Amino acid sequence: AFRFEAAEGRLQKIPSVSTIPDSIQERTGFSTAEIAIHPSGKFLYVSNRGHDSIALFGINEQSGKLSLKSVEPTRCQTPRHFVIAPGGKRLYAAGQASGTITAFTIDSKTGRLSFNKRILKVPKPVCIVFSRPISSTPKKP
């Protein structure tokens, strides 16, 4: 992990952290995939393939240091990608191997995820994107 030193215009290396709880010893086949920072800038989320979870880290505003807060099961297999919805209140995880998208509510104070008990069947989802509505009226030059 790195912290950007704006005054000097350089990156400073900061210690790496595990995205899997220390209690998990066997990690064969585990890898991280998506990384996203909550719009508040206070929380960082990382998806874990193999462990099928999303790790939540708190971000220290002064040092940029990460501290593991929780690891939430995604309730889908191989969470290749996830997205934080505009507004920062929801997170959606794409389970490539399970063919599902699962939904979570984000606690605005703690960043913790709560499963919404919503599972959408989709053939091999690998990415979720929110976009703005497309206007049918052309813009004037």
Task: Tell where the protein language model's regions lie, with residue ranges.
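Feature marking well-ordered beta-strand scaffolds used for ligand recognition
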Residues: 1-141
